[in-house]
Amino acid sequence: MTCSIESAANGTSRNRLVWIVLCSLALLAWIPTVQQSVQMPLIPGTMGMRLGAFLLFWAVMMVAMMLPAFAPTLSFHLNVAGQQTPRSFISVRIALILSGYLCIWLLFGLPVFWLAQLSAYLAYAAPQNAIYFGMALLLCAGLYQFTPLAAYCLACCNPKLTTHAHMHKAPDYHKYSPVHDLRSGVLHGLYCLGACGGFMLILIPFGLMSLFWMIVITLVIFCEKVWQHGQTLSYLVASGLIFLSLLAWAIPSLLPGLHLG
């Protein structure tokens, strides 16, 4: 009984630490994200940023938008895998898992950069084609959410939708291993990308610097990952994206990120 109570107390302590760390990092990341959004004009593409500067901005933006939604999964992971981990190592494990997780989102910034560059080229060279490009992004993002892959990835990101069987298959799961923590972070990053990557792509037609859409996407992703009806929410949002993609054909101004202003 005493061991059970102590284990529960340790689990609560770990959960609290995870939420404090991730939400604090996200809050700090929102400061430069908001500043950048307010200072830079909403124009097509990467707002003049080259690849290095864009990836730096993208990394900060991902910390702001994604970490609160990752807290439940990381808490679950540490509660299952960290029972025999000394308390002094918990912070180290959080840092290692986050490193692997954020690496995936940083790499995802590469195709986003090139797609944004393409959208800018089309906006200048063929404005009507730019609108079609934006419509295609919205349509693909919406349709993808109805695929089995998206549903599976979301289930792996929401502790209320899955048993997290993929975690328990990991070798030496109850032994502390920096390599395993990095691997787990990468794995969770891939699942998260599979569940939410499409939502990030819609920032291109809506504007990569659109603070409004950043907040909307952040809230949608957070609710998807902490709510027991997250899958239903995903379908509803996806339906809305499909509708917007069709509506944009008649009202191109719905895609401000593809207009020269």
Tell me what each language-model feature is:
Residues 2-14, 38-51, 121-137, 143-190, ...:
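Alpha-helical multi-pass membrane helix bundles of inner-membrane/thylakoid proteins
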